[in-house]
């Protein structure tokens, strides 16, 4: 991606209370960092910190059809970088921690106390597993003692009590040890210490991993929700109440009083956006670039597009992730990435990394109506080549049907 940063004008201090949809779109892209050029030199930890600080979290998804989503979110803004840098921030320097936030996410460790209210009510899964916890409390205690004695452990490291089946029929969690560790993680007793090469999580006591200044801090539910809405508002730039609530999976009814407080103290301003129903909220630091010159493929789990209704409102782009849909029912493809060109989502690319043969496969490309293909094609080809090099793939192969209208 080659991005030329446009001149920007701050609109947080402007008195007008209406934005066109094109202006709202540029505000949202700027808030997400897409109006900025990718770094010209080597990407380092400072660049990653800046992006994560702007977004507030990275949704975790390890589906590896192309690349795990959390790595691509950074790539879309920074260009090629060493993926080990993100692992270093999370699992070595421990500046980030895995938490249930939007979904499973990496969040700055400072947010540990603000997600405490979610940990308190984290559901017991699968249904009926609470009876196992009641009947085998000694096993639960033993697991915690083993972790304390041996250090971080994964589900595969844990044996079962005599006479108890290891497997959980009909549950995505698979085994009793995994369900138990997931439960203790969800409630904040454990935290993720590392990801093994298989991507399996190894857990340790949370107080061993989270600095005391955060682990020992308690914030009220209202204070926590206010901070989460504040982060969402800064990351979105312009948003509806539902958009702001969804960023950290809050209920809209819970979010609205916190939004009103942020309006009252001047951090948000209530405005209208062309074509949107009801009010929108503009963050006081939001910027309106004169133009956005982005050219990048966007992960399905990128905060820019993870709320599909917002994506359609901002871009007129009806996006559905079809990987879990039977092949014969798919419209666009298995792992389809929107292509952001300028300030529009102009195409959908069904992409696959063929690592065995060193190829990045563009299985199909579907252009949005009205797209100037002569203008977009060179930018898309450049981005595919850049992504292939980042993934250490030798060539890009575009199938014969990979340039469809």
Predicted stretch roles:
Residues 2-297, 302-305, 310, 317-336, ...:
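Long, low-complexity intrinsically disordered regions
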């Amino acid at each position: 991606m080659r991005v030329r940063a446009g001149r920007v004008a701050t609109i947080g201090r402007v008195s007008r209370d209406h934005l066109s949809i094109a202006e709202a779109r540029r505000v949202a892209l700027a808030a997400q960092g897409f109006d900025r050029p990718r770094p010209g030199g080597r990407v380092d930890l400072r660049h990653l910190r800046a992006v994560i600080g702007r977004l507030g979290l990275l949704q975790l998804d390890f589906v590896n059809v192309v690349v795990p989503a959390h790595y691509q979110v950074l790539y879309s803004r920074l260009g090629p970088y060493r993926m080990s840098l993100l692992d270093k921030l999370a699992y070595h320097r421990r500046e980030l921690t895995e938490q249930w936030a939007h979904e499973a996410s990496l969040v700055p460790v400072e947010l540990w106390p603000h997600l405490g209210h979610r940990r308190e009510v984290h559901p017991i899964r699968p249904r009926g597993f609470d009876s196992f916890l009641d009947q085998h409390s000694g096993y639960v205690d033993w697991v915690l003692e083993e972790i304390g004695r041996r250090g971080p452990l994964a589900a595969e490291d844990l044996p079962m009590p005599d006479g108890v089946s290891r497997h959980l029929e009909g549950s995505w969690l698979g085994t009793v040890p995994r369900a138990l560790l997931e439960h203790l993680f969800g409630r904040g007793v454990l935290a993720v210490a590392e990801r093994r090469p298989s991507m399996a999580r190894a857990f340790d006591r949370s107080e061993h991993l989270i600095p005391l200044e955060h682990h020992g801090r308690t914030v009220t539910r209202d204070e926590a929700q206010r901070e989460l809405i504040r982060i969402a508002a800064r990351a979105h730039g312009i948003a509806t109440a539902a958009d702001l609530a969804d960023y950290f999976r809050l209920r809209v009814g819970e979010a609205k009083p916190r939004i009103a407080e942020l309006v009252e103290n001047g951090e948000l301003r209530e405005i209208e956006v062309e074509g949107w129903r009801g009010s929108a909220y503009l963050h006081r630091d939001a910027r309106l670039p004169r133009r956005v010159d982005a050219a990048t493929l966007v992960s399905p789990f990128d905060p820019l597009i993870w709320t599909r209704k917002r994506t359609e409102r901002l871009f007129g782009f009806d996006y559905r992730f079809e990987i879990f849909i039977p092949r014969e029912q798919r419209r666009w493809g298995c792992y389809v990435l929107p292509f952001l060109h300028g300030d529009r989502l102009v195409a959908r690319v069904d992409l696959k990394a063929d690592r065995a043969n060193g190829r990045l496969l563009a299985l199909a490309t579907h252009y949005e109506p009205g797209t100037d293909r002569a203008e977009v094609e060179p930018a898309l080809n450049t981005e595919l080549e850049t992504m292939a090099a980042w993934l250490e793939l030798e060539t890009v192969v575009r199938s014969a049907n990979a340039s469809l209208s």
